């Protein structure tokens, strides 16, 4: 589980000075000092190719506009997770899900994020 990797993520963040995002059923973002968990997403996200690569690109975009690397990591987990939930509601099969995920990420609104985000600071 992603919780099993949390200590290693904290150590890596402290060692590098970067934020680390560990994905799974629960996503964990840490800067080594603070840990934030998010519980958005859908299991289908692990069954299609390219979600991790897309998260890397989204992290870079969030880092460009976020006040901290930790905030960028949390934003990435929440945005991609919510898009995954919405995509599965529209397209429950893997082929169409992959396309819907991109479409939902594109059309994600601030209202969607406010209504659906599940964030907990640990």
What does each of the following model-derived ranges do?
Residues 82-122:
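Charged C-terminal helix
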Residues 8-13, 69-84, 101-102:
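Short, well-structured alpha-helical segments that form the helix of a local strand-helix-strand
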Residues 1-35:
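Conserved phosphate/ATP/ADP-binding segment of small-molecule kinases
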Residues 3-6, 53, 70, 74, ...:
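Electropositive phosphate-/nucleotide-binding environments in soluble metabolic enzymes
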Residues 18-21, 27, 35-37, 56, ...:
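Structural motif
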Residues 25-26, 42-43, 76-82:
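Glycine-rich beta-alpha junction loops
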Residues 47-79:
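Short, small-residue alpha-helix embedded
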Residues 33-45:
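Glycine/charged-rich beta-loop-alpha catalytic/anionic-binding loops adjacent to active sites
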């Amino acid at each position: 589980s992603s919780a099993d990797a949390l200590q290693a993520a904290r150590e890596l963040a402290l060692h590098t000075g970067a934020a680390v995002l560990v994905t799974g059923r629960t996503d964990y973002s840490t800067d080594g000092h603070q840990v934030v968990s998010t519980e958005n997403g859908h299991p289908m996200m692990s069954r299609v190719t390219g979600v991790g690569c897309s998260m890397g690109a989204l992290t870079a975009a969030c880092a460009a506009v976020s006040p901290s690397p930790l905030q960028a990591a949390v934003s990435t987990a929440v945005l991609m997770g919510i898009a995954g939930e919405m995509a599965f509601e529209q397209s429950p099969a893997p082929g169409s899900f992959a396309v819907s995920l991109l479409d939902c990420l594109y059309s994600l609104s601030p209202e969607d994020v406010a209504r659906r985000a599940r964030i907990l600071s640990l």
